[in-house]
From Swiss-Prot:
Coiled coil feature spans: none
Region called Disordered, residue ranges: 339-381
PROSITE patterns to which the protein is assigned, alphabetical: AAA (PS00674)
Protein name according to UniProt: ATP-dependent zinc metalloprotease FtsH homolog
Presence of the UniProt keyword Oxidoreductase in the record: no
Native source organism of the sequence: Haemophilus influenzae (strain ATCC 51907 / DSM 11121 / KW20 / Rd)
Binding site for Zn(2+): H159, H163, D237
Lineage: Bacteria, Pseudomonadati, Pseudomonadota, Gammaproteobacteria, Pasteurellales
Cofactor section: Zn(2+)
Any one GO molecular-function label of the UniProt entry: ATP hydrolysis activity
Length: 381
């Protein structure tokens, strides 16, 4: 209703614009002593008509951002009242492990955990179910029905191991939380990094570390199988890395050659009331320089990731073996591999699902009840 009035294209917006005009007139018509307060909400303030936010109309704006760790804890406690949770479930622990979650995401987390518990006839929801629910939300649902050959599993394991090793060793990178070669969503495998806290901003060093990590999966395939046998699994990694590198140059001022200047501007769609004309903000020479700077950033981080993997080929092979054997490894196994120590099985590995359910029931019944870098294959999308 409050969308910005357009440039007259489409022909189907006349009634909507007349409604907006009438609302603006009515809001102007309120006298000062009527005591009428008009409240509205939107998750797209960028498309609002400027007339709506002028003084005398919606002139007070309250931004409701994502909850911090304390807010997430309180939200989780509210939703956890609706399910029977075990005593080992700690809302603060879950809150620390869910940075960037919205209130709806947290509600979904509790619901998914309850569903996992119900599928194995458990009376209470334990931390195991919450971890499974978190993995499903963060990395997508498991596709156990997808059959992968031994060669595909090995290739995916090397790819994900490359991400994990470089992400573990580059400076100021988010810690590696979990690596899996079980197909999830549209990905053949996932390496999930979990931030240690809420991130407000990110430094150039962190961005470059992320670039090295994104290219590490492709590089691992290159080092093991040769350049001619690299798969299409790194397509999404390349897309994300290229966007980061270009934004570093054109928006965030991380290029010494071009300086802290904005070289791109999102003018928006004409159907949202933006101008039909497309302005050119740079010369052809500047555009060429931007491309050169983007390539330079990518090349130096590509080279760094390659050097790290060459220096740690023994860890790459060992992590591949662990992934092929266990399919999913967690922080403890990753730390053991990086320290070149023997690998212990991950939690819950080696027990049939029925035994796991029976064991969980026997433990929870004794207590009183009281909360990615992906390897994608374009041909499977």
């Amino acid at each position: 209703m409050g969308r910005q009035r357009g440039a007259g294209l489409g022909g189907g917006h006349d009634e909507r614009e007349q409604t907006l005009n009438q609302m603006l007139v009515e809001m102007d018509g309120f006298s000062g002593n009527d005591g009428v307060i008009v409240i509205a909400a939107t998750n797209r303030p960028d498309v609002l008509d400027p007339a709506l936010t002028r003084p005398g109309r919606f002139d007070r704006q309250v931004v409701v951002g994502l909850p911090d760790v304390k807010g997430r804890e309180q939200i989780l406690k509210v939703h956890m009242r609706k399910v029977s949770v075990a005593q080992d479930v700690d809302a603060m622990t879950l809150a620390r492990g869910t940075p960037g979650y919205s209130g709806a995401d947290l509600a979904n987390l509790v619901n998914e955990a309850a569903l996992f518990a119900a599928r194995v006839n458990k009376r209470t929801v334990t931390m195991l179910e919450f971890e499974k629910a978190k993995d499903k939300i963060n990395m997508g649902p498991e596709r156990r029905t997808m059959i992968m050959t031994d060669k595909q599993k090995e290739s995916t394991a090397y790819h994900e191991a490359g991400h994990a090793i470089v992400g573990y060793l580059v400076p100021e990178h988010d810690p590696v939380h979990k690596v899996t070669i079980i197909p999830r969503g549209r990905a053949l495998g996932v390496t999930f990094f979990l931030p240690e806290g809420d991130q407000i901003s990110i430094s150039q060093k962190q961005l470059e570390s992320k670039l090295s990590t994104l290219y590490a999966g492709r590089l691992a395939e290159d080092l093991i199988y040769g350049e001619e046998n690299i798969s299409t699994g790194a397509s999404n990694d390349i897309k994300v890395a290229t966007n980061i590198a270009r934004n570093m140059v054109t928006q965030w001022g991380f290029s010494e050659k071009l300086g802290p200047i904005l070289y791109t501007e999102d003018e928006g769609e004409v159907f949202l009331g933006r101008s039909m004309a497309k302005a050119k903000h740079m010369s052809d020479e500047t555009a060429h320089s931007i491309d050169e700077e983007v390539r330079a950033i990518v090349n130096r981080n590509y080279a760094r990731a390659r050097e790290i993997l060459i220096d740690n080929m023994d860890i790459l092979h060992a992590m591949k073996d662990a992934l092929v054997k266990y399919e999913t490894i967690e922080e403890e196994q990753i730390k053991q591999l990086m320290n070149r120590e023997p690998v212990t099985p991950p939690s819950g590995w080696g027990e049939p699902k029925t035994q796991q359910a029976a064991y969980a029931n026997s433990t929870t019944n004794d207590t009183k009840p009281e909360s990615a870098v992906e390897n994608t294959d374009d041909f499977n999308v």
